[in-house]
Structures are given as structure tokens and as C-alpha cells.
From Swiss-Prot:
Stated role: PsaA and PsaB bind P700, the primary electron donor of photosystem I (PSI), as well as the electron acceptors A0, A1 and FX. PSI is a plastocyanin/cytochrome c6-ferredoxin oxidoreductase, converting photonic excitation into a charge separation, which transfers an electron from the donor P700 chlorophyll pair to the spectroscopically characterized acceptors A0, A1, FX, FA and FB in turn. Oxidized P700 is reduced on the lumenal side of the thylakoid membrane by plastocyanin or cytochrome c6.
Amino acids binding [4Fe-4S] cluster: C562, C571
Membrane topology annotation: Multi-pass membrane protein
Cofactor binding description: PSI electron transfer chain: 5 chlorophyll a, 1 chlorophyll a', 2 phylloquinones and 3 4Fe-4S clusters. PSI core antenna: 90 chlorophyll a, 22 carotenoids, 3 phospholipids and 1 galactolipid. P700 is a chlorophyll a/chlorophyll a' dimer, A0 is one or more chlorophyll a, A1 is one or both phylloquinones and FX is a shared 4Fe-4S iron-sulfur center.
Protein's name in the database: Photosystem I P700 chlorophyll a apoprotein A1
Binding site for chlorophyll a: M672, Y680
InterPro entries, alphabetized: PSI_PsaA (IPR006243), PSI_PsaA/B (IPR001280), PSI_PsaA/B_CS (IPR020586), PSI_PsaA/B_sf (IPR036408)
Protein's GO biological process: photosynthesis
Cellular component, GO annotation: photosystem I; plasma membrane-derived thylakoid membrane
Reaction catalysed by this enzyme: reduced [plastocyanin] + hnu + oxidized [2Fe-2S]-[ferredoxin] = oxidized [plastocyanin] + reduced [2Fe-2S]-[ferredoxin]
Tree of life domain: Bacteria
Recorded GO MF terms: 4 iron, 4 sulfur cluster binding; chlorophyll binding; electron transfer activity; magnesium ion binding; oxidoreductase activity
Length: 739
């Protein structure tokens, strides 16, 4: 299929670049009131509101993607530059179990020098928990010069992306049919991006990472390791991996087993580094590459063979599903909001899956014994996943309001879900009530029994047991199965299911995670909070066009404060408001998830190996006995573990002590926006303006109180920011102290 582009569709205008709000007639006139700056930010990237031409909207989104990639490359470049210029990476490489990673040095302008703690090896700096040192070692970086070069490469890529964004909007812009060619896009993304991308990474792992890491593991100093290009010599590689002496002969004679010295299937963790075997990782990426290159030949493009997505979707109907998926292909090729909603839901869920793999199958050398990094990466991926999933709810509702055409969706699955929305939402609501009362009820019972001195009547591992038998069964199966399915493997996929304790330098990297009554109870709190988040987002989506309360909701748009005067009790019903409320429950859910993870790991996994071979855990296994009451969570988790952040003043961790307070302050500040009405502020502003007029200081731009929606947006933003900063400080001060 020929690539279709329009040449020079939009002239490059520096005049427009210099004019804020050029995309909107009202905004382009400049500010009359302070509302202008808020509307400018709200609408700058709302391409739907700037034009109704789907082709132009598609081009703007496409161009913005390149802008986004440019920002990512600049950000990554900065990370690598810090690693090259301000870090102890080379010292850490040679003594990774003793020296701590640092890639930031504070200038002592007003005495911040105290923050540069001693991280070992004669280096003073801020200890980082991004895990980049571990990633760099796995990739085969052996000196800071290589990091410099990569940082420069990142800037070159950023410049290229900025150019591409400009070029594909102003010089050669793709036609709409190019954006709508789903089959070609899928083939390209599967084969080229995922397939060839994985194959390229496999090549790097085999030719650079494996030899470098094998030498580092065996104790060779980083400065004595050959440079990457020296490994192109097969005789040098053959010293480490004998099959290299045979070249490509085993490949073409189908004697692939010969390559099993660097493409392995060991399972478990490398006992030197506490990470997945790098040769397993290379093998995995090779397999992924083969799978995706084949998958990228599935769809029918210019050759008349393969699948058509439209045909697959329309053929997919069961006996009870009416028209099935008919009409969904058109939705996904004409509504980018619908497409984005599906992708965000999937990517968000996948990101939370990644959070769990980072600790259960740690991919990078020495990462598993850096408890601060493990906690940071779990928290980071969990929260990012949560934001993406709420974004799915947001764009799903925007699709319903702006792009959904009921006439084109008669009796298909989407129409049937919308027509069943009362049954769906009322049942989901019942599930939420059931989960909430029962899960919380178990804690209320336990607190009451403990308060009354009746431990024998509590739900606990030593009284009335509520063992998670299904989870224990899954753990058991995963521990035993490899013995039958992969008899040559050394260990199972992950030690969290069962197996031996893996320790690096007398520090636990990973060990079996035993589950009991405490886990069963908090698991059902997770189930409750996640279901409530889904309830809010799904209700917002299903009722975004109409409801019994506001039948013409679709006409009011995605975000509106209330259904006008004389309609009391119609506030917070817009699609936007459901996203606003969903964010609080997302934060609520994930706070309990990361608290559960943090305490469980400190209690049952992280710790040191004593001379007699037993494990001394950080909090001595108190999770099973303390996490079964609300009082236990407050006393033995929040209060006991916040001692490090509260007592951090005067130490290298003191910034976290200040951030802990600042985060609480920002959180409290958010309540000022969430608990007060617009009228209060407008009244206050008018009295302040009167005072200015009295002094002949009248402002040229008229002050206006934030709109109701803007106030809620500022409120939820500061609520989340305050909560995230507080948690960040609490977790980091704690984990860096125990780490």
C-alpha cells in the first residue's frame, strides 16, 4: 500500500507560535479576566475543540506524539548525564554490595551539603532509588564515558523527534486513511517495533551484556573488561561462550542446542547478583522476537492474504449477544478517544503487573537487595498504572459524549451494555457494599476482640484461621510444576512461590512469601477498593450521555458543574466529575496496596542472614499478628515506621523530613478547594478588588474566582500531589534507613 501524505498542508507560522490561544477565537483576543489563563491550559491540547476535521485532529495527535518522545529523550538524556557526571557508578560497579548508588550531588548554597550522605567508596551524594545503576550494569555499561555518549545520543534523538513532529504536520502530513489503516499499523507495530525491537535487544544482550556481566560476576574489575567492539572477535567470545567458536554453523544445520551456553532455561535467580539469569533474559527476548515477527504477518494489507480486523470483529457473535461486535471497528478507527480508552486500560493493567514482576522476578543485578529501590519501583509502577486506568475511564466517557453515534450501534455489544447499565451498575454497587462491609467487618471484629482481651476469638493464624487456600494452592503448583514441565531448570519461575532463600552478601534478595489470615483480610480490602474505583468510572461512562436525573446530559458536554439553575441536586454528575471522584478512590486503593507491600516485604522477606542460617527480618515477622487489626496498621506500620522520617532532622535524610511536612501541608491546602464553594471566593475577591480600587491600583485583567470545575481540578491535583509527596518521604526515609 502506498503511503499517502499531503505536501505542505499547514504553513509554519512563527507569529502563531508567539500568540497564546491562537487556536481559539475567544482566547486569541487575549485576557480580559483571570479565567483566560485557565481556559488556555484546559483547551491547548483539546484538539477536538479546535477543529472538527478528523484528519487534522489525527495529524495534531500524531505530531504531539513526537513532541512527547522528544521530552522523554531529553529526560532520559539527563538521567544518563547525571550517571556520567555526578555519580559513583564506576566505584559501585566494583563493589555493588557495599557501596550505595548515588547520582546527585547537592550544592551547599544554604547548608544543603548535609544531604550529601556518605554512600561508601569515599563518595558523598544523595542515594538514588530509580534502579538505573542496576539497569546500566545489566546493559553492559562499564564506565562513565559510555554514559556520556548515550546521554548525547539521547539529545540527538530528541532533536530528531522535534523535527519529525514539525515535518509530519507542516511538510508531509499523513492522510486520514493512513491513520485508519489498522492492519498495516498492527503488522508494523508487531513485526517492526516489538519483533525487531526485541531482536535488536537480544543482539545487544548476547554480544555486549552477557560477556560484560559474566566477567563482572567473576570478579574482573570494570576497567579491565574489554570494550564492546572487542567482543566482535569470535575468539574472545569463545573463551566465555564456547559455541561462538562454531559460528553460524549450528544455526543453519538446526543444531540449535549448541547455543545453550548463552541461551539458557535455568529459572530462578543468579546467586551472585540476585537477579534473573541474563542468559535466560536473552533467550526470552529471542523467543518474543520470533513470536512477534510472525504475529506481524497476521493481518491483510496489500497482499490479499491474512486477517481483516473488521471481518474478525463482525464474525464474532454468540447466541445471546445480538449483533456482537458489529460497528466496533468503525468506532475504533474514527474515535481516537475510544482507541485511547482501551489502550490505557490495557497498558495501566500491564503496568501494575510489571510492578509485581519487578520484585518477584528482579531483572537487574543487585537490585533485589536494594530495598529502597524495590519499594520505589513497586510504588511507582502501581501509581502510574492507576493513573492510566483512570485515564481509560476519562477517555471512555469523552468518547461517549463526543464520538458515540447511537444510530450506528443498534443491538451490538456496546449498545447492549448501555441498555443493561442499570442492572450492571446496581449489581456492581451491591458487590461493593458486600465487599466493604465484610472485609472491613473482619477488622472491626478483630479490633473489638483485641480491645476486650479475647485473642482466642479473633480471626488470626493462631485462633479462627482464614487461610487463603486458593492462593496457597497456586503458589504450590508454581513451585512444583517446573519439576515436570521443565525438568532441566534449576529453579521455578520465582522464589516468591516457594523454593530456597536467595541471599547476596548475607542480605535477603528473595525468598518464599508465605500467605496467611492477615493477607486474606487485606486482599479483600483491595478487592473492595478496586471495585469501588471501577464502579465510579464505569457509572461515569455508562451514564455520560443521559440519566434519569439529567436526561440531556450529552448536550451539556463532558464537564459541567450542575444542570443549571432550578435543578438542585444535579451537581457532580458530568463525565468529568466521575473521573474526579474516581481519582480519589484510585489513590485510596493503591495507598493500601503499597502499604501492604511495604510492610509484608519488611516483615516476611527483607532482612539479614544470621550465622546459624536463619533469617532476621526487618520487622521480625510482625505482619501476620499486627496487620489483622486497624490499630495494628496505625501503631505498627504507620506510626512505628514513620520514626525515621520524623527523626530525620540533622541527618542526610532531613530533606525527607521537610517533604513529609510539606506533603501534609499541600494535602491540607487541597481541602480548601474541595470543601468550599465558588460563591465564597467570588465574594472575597470582590471585596479585595474594592480595596484595590480605593487605592487606585485597579488590575487591568479582572480577577475571577475559579469555576466550580476548575476548583475541583486544583483540589484533586493538590490532594494527590500532597499524598504522593508524603508517601514518598515516608517510604524513602524508612527504606534508606533499613536498607
Amino acid at each position: 500500500m502506498a503511503v499517502k501524505v499531503d505536501k505542505d498542508p499547514v504553513p509554519t507560522s512563527f507569529e502563531k507560535w508567539g500568540k497564546p490561544g491562537h487556536f481559539d477565537r475567544t482566547l486569541a483576543r487575549g485576557p480580559k479576566t483571570t479565567t483566560w489563563i485557565w481556559n488556555l491550559h484546559a483547551d491547548a491540547h483539546d484538539f477536538d475543540s479546535q477543529t472538527s476535521d478528523l484528519e487534522d485532529i489525527s495529524r495534531k495527535i500524531f505530531s504531539a506524539h513526537f513532541g512527547h518522545l522528544a521530552v522523554v529523550f531529553v529526560w532520559l538524556s539527563g538521567m544518563y548525564f547525571h550517571g556520567a557526571k555526578f555519580s559513583n557508578y564506576e566505584a559501585w560497579l566494583n563493589n555493588p554490595t557495599v557501596i550505595k548508588p548515588s547520582a546527585q550531588v547537592v550544592w551547599p548554597v544554604v547548608g544543603q551539603g548535609i544531604l550529601n550522605g556518605d554512600v561508601g567508596g569515599g563518595f558523598s551524594g544523595i542515594q538514588i532509588t530509580s534502579g538505573l545503576f542496576y539497569l546500566w550494569r545489566a546493559a553492559g555499561f562499564t564506565n562513565s564515558y559510555q554514559l556520556y555518549v548515550t546521554a548525547i545520543g539521547g539529545l540527538v534523538m530528541a532533536a530528531l523527534m522535534v523535527f519529525a513532529g514539525w515535518f509530519h504536520y507542516h511538510k508531509a502530513a499523513p492522510k486520514l486513511e493512513w491513520f485508519q489503516n489498522a492492519e498495516a499499523m498492527m503488522n508494523h507495530h508487531l513485526s517492526v517495533l516489538l519483533g525487531c525491537g526485541s531482536l535488536g535487544w537480544t543482539g545487544h544482550l548476547i554480544h555486549v551484556s552477557l560477556p560484560v556481566n559474566k566477567l563482572l560476576d567473576s570478579g574482573v574489575a570494570a576497567k579491565d573488561i574489554p570494550l564492546p567492539h572487542e567482543f566482535f572477535d569470535a575468539s574472545v567470545m569463545a573463551e566465555l561462550y564456547p559455541s561462538f567458536a562454531q559460528g553460524l554453523k549450528p544455526f543453519f544445520t538446526l543444531d540449535w542446542a549448541a547455543y545453550s551456553d548463552f541461551l539458557t532455561f535455568k529459572g530462578g535467580l543468579n546467586p551472585t547478583t540476585g537477579s534473573l539469569w541474563l542468559s535466560d533474559v536473552a533467550h526470552h527476548h529471542l523467543a518474543i522476537a520470533v513470536l512477534f515477527i510472525i504475529a506481524g504477518h497476521m493481518y491483510r494489507t496489500g497482499f490479499g492474504i491474512g486477517h481483516s480486523m473488521k471481518e474478525i470483529l463482525e464474525a464474532h457473535k454468540g447466541p445471546f449477544t445480538g449483533e456482537g461486535h458489529k460497528g466496533l471497528y468503525e468506532i475504533l478507527t474514527t474515535s481516537w478517544h475510544a482507541q485511547l480508552a482501551v489502550n490505557l486500560a490495557l497498558l495501566g493493567s500491564l503496568t501494575i503487573v510489571i510492578a509485581h514482576h519487578m520484585y518477584s522476578m528482579p531483572p537487574y543485578p543487585y537490585m533485589a537487595t536494594d530495598y529502597g529501590t524495590q519499594l520505589s519501583l513497586f510504588t511507582h509502577h502501581t501509581w502510574i498504572g492507576g493513573f492510566l486506568i483512570v485515564g481509560a475511564g476519562a477517555h471512555g466517557a469523552i468518547f461517549m459524549v463526543r464520538d458515540y453515534d447511537p444510530a450506528k450501534n443498534v443491538n451490538n455489544l456496546l449498545d447492549r451494555v448501555i441498555r443493561h447499565r442499570d442492572a450492571i451498575i446496581s449489581h456492581l454497587n451491591w458487590v461493593c457494599i458486600f465487599l466493604g462491609f465484610h472485609s472491613f467487618g473482619l477488622y472491626i471484629h478483630n479490633d473489638t476482640m483485641r480491645a476486650l482481651g479475647r485473642p482466642q476469638d479473633m480471626f488470626s493464624d493462631s485462633a479462627i484461621q482464614l487461610q487463603p487456600i486458593f492462593a496457597q494452592w497456586i503458589q504450590n503448583i508454581h513451585t512444583l510444576a517446573p519439576g515436570g514441565t521443565a525438568p532441566n531448570a534449576i529453579a521455578s519461575a520465582s522464589q516468591v512461590f516457594g523454593g530456597d532463600v536467595v541471599a547476596i552478601g548475607n542480605k535477603v534478595a528473595l525468598m518464599p512469601i508465605t500467605l496467611g489470615t492477615a493477607d486474606f483480610m487485606v486482599h479483600h480490602i483491595h478487592a473492595f477498593t478496586i471495585h469501588v474505583t471501577v464502579l465510579i468510572l464505569l457509572k461515569g461512562l455508562l451514564y455520560s450521555r443521559s440519566s434519569r436525573l439529567v436526561p440531556d446530559k450529552g448536550q451539556l458536554g463532558f464537564r459541567f458543574p450542575c444542570d443549571g439553575p432550578g435543578r438542585g441536586g444535579t451537581c457532580q454528575v458530568s463525565g468529568w466529575d466521575h473521573v474526579f471522584l474516581g481519582l480519589f478512590w484510585m489513590y485510596n486503593s493503591l495507598s493500601i496496596v503499597i502499604f501492604h507491600f511495604s510492610w509484608k516485604m519488611q516483615s516476611d522477606v527483607w532482612g539479614t542472614i544470621l550465622p546459624d542460617g536463619s533469617v532476621s527480618h526487618v520487622t521480625g515477622g510482625n505482619f501476620a499478628t499486627s496487620a489483622i487489626t486497624i490499630n495494628g496498621w496505625l501503631r505498627d506500620f504507620l506510626w512505628a515506621q514513620s520514626s525515621q522520617v520524623i527523626n530525620s532532622y540533622g541527618s542526610a535524610l532531613s530533606a525527607y523530613g521537610i517533604m513529609f511536612l510539606a506533603g501534609h501541608f499541600v494535602f491540607a491546602f487541597s481541602l480548601m478547594f474541595l470543601f468550599s464553594g465558588r460563591g465564597y471566593w467570588q465574594e472575597l475577591i470582590e471585596s479585595i478588588v474594592w480595596a484595590h480600587n480605593k487605592l487606585k491600583l485597579a488590575p487591568a485583567i479582572q480577577p475571577r474566582a475559579l469555576s466550580i470545575v476548575q476548583g475541583r481540578a486544583v483540589g484533586v491535583a493538590h490532594y494527590l500531589l500532597g499524598g504522593i509527596v508524603t508517601t514518598w518521604a515516608f517510604f524513602l526515609a524508612r527504606s534508606l534507613s533499613i536498607g
